[in-house]
Amino acid sequence: MDQDALISKEDSEVEREASGGRESLSDVIGFLDAVLSSEPTDIGGDRSWLHNTINTLQRPGSTHRVKGEGEGEVSTSSTQDNRSGEESRVSGGTSEPEAEAHARNVDKQNIHWATGRGASTDSVPQDLGNGRDSGILEDPPNEGGYPRSGAEDENREMAANPDKRGEDQAEGLPEEIRRSAPLPDEREGRADNNGRGVEPGSPHSARVTGVLVIPSPELEEAVLQRNKRRPANSGSRSLTPVVVPSTRSPPPDHDNSTRSPPRKPPTTQDEHTNPRNTPAVRIKDRRPPTGTRSAPDRPTDGYPTHPSPETDATKKGIEENTSSMKEMATLLTSLGVIQSAQEFESSRDASYVFAKRALKSANYAEMAFNVCGLILSAEKSFANRVDENKQLLKQIQESVESFRDIYKRFSEYQKEQNSLLMSNLSTLHIITDRGGKTDNPDSPTRSPSVFAKTKENKTKATRFDPSMETMGDMRYKPDLLREDEFREEIRNPVYQERDTEPRASNASRLLPSREKPTIHSLKLVIESSPLSRAEKAAYVKSLSKCKTDQEVKAVMELVEEDIESLTN
């Protein structure tokens, strides 16, 4: 079957769906089987009819009318029918993946749009104005030469031969869908619902997906038989309410201390009677229940009565256990483990509860059970204590680390304070011992530079006159001559002045200068030294106060000593 027959089939399918006639979905599935069982389109065949000139106005039968239930007439084209048929094929459960079907739909739609655009300029606004009609030819020429068959003829043939579905079975479509009962038809077409009309009729199963399970009488009988097997031993199960009152009511001659704890495992006979509902852990304990022990003379249906010697031994063991529990409480009180015997009785701790059970136990199996519980509860309490100690040690370690950090910062701060204090002391040492210079530096007595506030005798500043150079006073000599007198004494080359202007006139010496170049270079030497900032400031200040070369030399010797002490 070629593609023309496929498109015309799907067009007739959409016409029949939209005309208002109600069909069951089983017929739809049968029609899908007929479509899917056909041979695939020959891809390498002649498809030149797709590129013929399209003129939708010449072919009045290219579009058809579709009328909805509550809407007006809407004209649909073969492109939309083709798309809806493809979508119904995908939703019908074919074996090809959804991605291939979607790619084929897009490919077809692109071909139709390409032919529609290449036809003429008149077809473009027509395609854009009507969003659904792409202008494809309704009945393209049959160049393949295949015989055409109408959709109505095939539907009649499928209705006449219902067994043809099994013969025309497609790959991947399960047989259960084909043999199922007709599903109820939803009130909307698959073209509008994207093929989801089949979904509400299929029962959902979490284990088997994609297979429709139809309930049959045999299946119902099997389910009823399976449900009837559970209460099979109901006669033996009805015995349990008789045992419960005897378990709950203790005999009047025992006090509350002899009452057995409520968390007792059941008896061995209970395990044989109802093996399905009992946990696997309780099979190990084979002691008789407490109610049977405390009321031996009351016979119950299905339980043999215990002989009286065993009952007497049980009562005797319970009395002995009560006395031993009192002795244990007294011992624990005397050792200081607990405050009083009442605390041992009323304690809800797991170890105390298992210890009381072990002391009250009547046989070795019960005692072994309770001793195991006591050991496990003690081990659990020890593990909890170990965890608490680990948390405490972790907190202590964190606090120690924080203290180390604080101590480190404090030690750095202390070093900084010590260096500041030492610089202050060195400054004070320079001010007191090296300061307060007099005119005679050789005099042993040195007056401090810090004076009390007294009236100072201000010397009148004498104005410089060039005739003062000839006088014998050292202060009025020019600087170059003055430096030359001490040139032999200064061994350090730092003190040597650079003769920047050797041919300077005599008048350049008359200009007042605030600072000698030698003092300036010495200050630069001090500033570039590795001393602290306070020491540098103190030495520069003391250097500016010097009046003679001997004082400058003494200050620089101190600077050199400090630098050597730092470097060494």
Curated annotation (Swiss-Prot):
Multimerization: region residues: 344-411
Subcellular location: Host cytoplasm
GO MF annotations, alphabetized: RNA binding; RNA-directed RNA polymerase activity
Coiled coil: 364-429
Highest taxon listed in the record's lineage: Viruses
Region entry Interaction with the nucleocapsid (N-RNA), spans: 479-568
Compositionally biased spans, kind Basic and acidic residues: 7-20, 99-110, 150-168, 175-193, 453-462
Residue positions, PTM Phosphoserine: S249, S257, S260, S447, S449
Residues annotated as transmembrane: none
Record's GO cellular component terms: host cell cytoplasm
Region (Disordered): 1-23, 54-317, 433-462
Membership in a protein family: Belongs to the respirovirus P protein family.
Miscellaneous note of the record: The P/V/C gene has two overlapping open reading frames. One encodes the P/V/W proteins and the other the C/Y proteins.
Description of how the protein assembles with itself and partners: Homotetramer. Interacts (via multimerization domain) with polymerase L; this interaction forms the polymerase complex. Interacts (via N-terminus) with N0; this interaction allows P to chaperon N0 before encapsidation and form the N-P complex. Interacts (via C-terminus) with N-RNA template; this interaction positions the polymerase on the template.
UniProt name for this protein: Phosphoprotein
Organism for this UniProt entry: Sendai virus (strain Ohita) (SeV)
